Amino acid sequence: MNILSKIKIPEFCMSHWLLRIPLAIIFIQQGLMKIPVDIEEAASYGLSYLVWWFVAYGELLGGIGLVVGGLLNKPYLPILDRCYIPDIGDAITRFSGFTLGCIMTGVIWIGEPESLMDVILYDNLHVLLWVGALFFALRGNHAK
């Protein structure tokens, strides 16, 4: 018998917060930097005003949605037991992750990289944010 299989490792069921909080802070901060939405700033990136508006508010609300979706995972206050809907927090988390993943895909595309290796080697912050957003889009509140 394998000796490692006998060792019981405790499960830290709140570990998703170690990824959720920093990701939310980055996206909220980036969204707040773009507000008020300015047409000249949108034009400097070659985007229309409407797209820039969706990016700014998508980053802000997506970051807030990551936190709110995690908080709605379980009723933390006894008064919330009556109005608790188990899947609403998961849906908010998944939608926020999907929205942020779409925004990060656009950010990477706007950089017009020459190859996939350029993205992986030189645009690693955006790739990290993209992967974090996709993690919550795919796992939702079922992340451990």
Positions of the model-derived regions?
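Extended, low-polarity transmembrane helix blocks
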Residues: 1-36, 51-144
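Membrane-interface interhelical connector segments
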Residues: 35-49
